[in-house]
């Protein structure tokens, strides 16, 4: 299964990242109060998907890249 992991972004109340899969569509991420916590959670998500045998995990660095890969 392919997953696209978005960059950490500022949101109301903190920082978050989103994920997208062809099967489930967009999954909004939890909002963390500290940017360090959001980056840590994003890295854990990327590693856990890779370890579970995900066919392809793509970690995006920019919003433009995330949008381009999810349309």
List each language-model region with its residue ranges.
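Short amphipathic alpha-helices within nucleic acid-binding modules
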Residues: 38-40
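Short N-terminal "domain-start" leader segments
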Residues: 1-18, 47, 53-71
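Basic, amphipathic alpha-helical segments enriched in Lys/Arg and hydrophobic/aromatic residues
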Residues: 43
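A short, exposed loop/beta-hairpin motif centered on an aromatic-Gly-Thr core
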Residues: 24-36, 58
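Short acidic, glycine-rich loop/turn motifs
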Residues: 19-23
């Amino acid at each position: 299964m392919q997953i696209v992991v978005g960059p950490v972004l500022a949101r109301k109340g903190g920082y978050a990242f989103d994920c997208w899969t062809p099967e489930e569509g967009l999954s909004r991420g939890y909002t963390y109060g500290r940017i360090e916590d959001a980056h840590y959670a994003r890295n854990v998500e990327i590693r856990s998907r890779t370890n579970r045998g995900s066919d392809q995990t793509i970690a995006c660095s920019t919003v433009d890249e995330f949008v381009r890969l999810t349309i």
